[in-house]
């Protein structure tokens, strides 16, 4: 278990700055299958998970939802036949926070 897996999300009130690019690059080394995607000026951590069918994709979506509820931090989820796209970012700051890296790390363990 990594240190990030042991951490929990902290409430973000919107006064924090998004993660600095250098720190984000360092954190990405812990989650190499995730990409930073610019979505209309908002950076997001994104990964596409693949599954054998829709039911497996849906089961994974539910597990991500349960994790999100337990941590009080919620992603965008796109569930399709055989794949789920998970996007983590912090709405309140319009960018990526350590909470998002923590959640991406925890999401990895749900597969």
Swiss-Prot record:
What are the disulfide bonds? none
The superkingdom listed in its UniProt entry is: Bacteria
Keyword Lyase listed: yes
Q: For this protein, what is any one GO molecular function term?
A: 4-alpha-hydroxytetrahydrobiopterin dehydratase activity
InterPro entries assigned: PCD_sf, Pterin-4-alpha-carb_dehyd, Pterin_deHydtase
Q: What class of enzyme is it?
A: lyase
Q: Does the keyword rRNA processing apply?
A: no
Entry-linked Pfam families = Pterin_4a
- List keywords of the entry alphabetically: Lyase
Q: Extract one GO BP annotation from the record.
A: tetrahydrobiopterin biosynthetic process
The UniProt catalytic activity note for this protein reads: (4aS,6R)-4a-hydroxy-L-erythro-5,6,7,8-tetrahydrobiopterin = (6R)-L-erythro-6,7-dihydrobiopterin + H2O
**Known Gene3D superfamilies for this protein?**
Transcriptional coactivator/pterin dehydratase
- SUPFAM superfamilies recorded: PCD-like (SSF55248)
Q: What is its EC number?
A: 4.2.1.96
Which family does this protein fall into? Belongs to the pterin-4-alpha-carbinolamine dehydratase family.
Output this protein's name. Answer: Putative pterin-4-alpha-carbinolamine dehydratase
Per the UniProt record, the source organism is Chlorobaculum parvum (strain DSM 263 / NCIMB 8327)
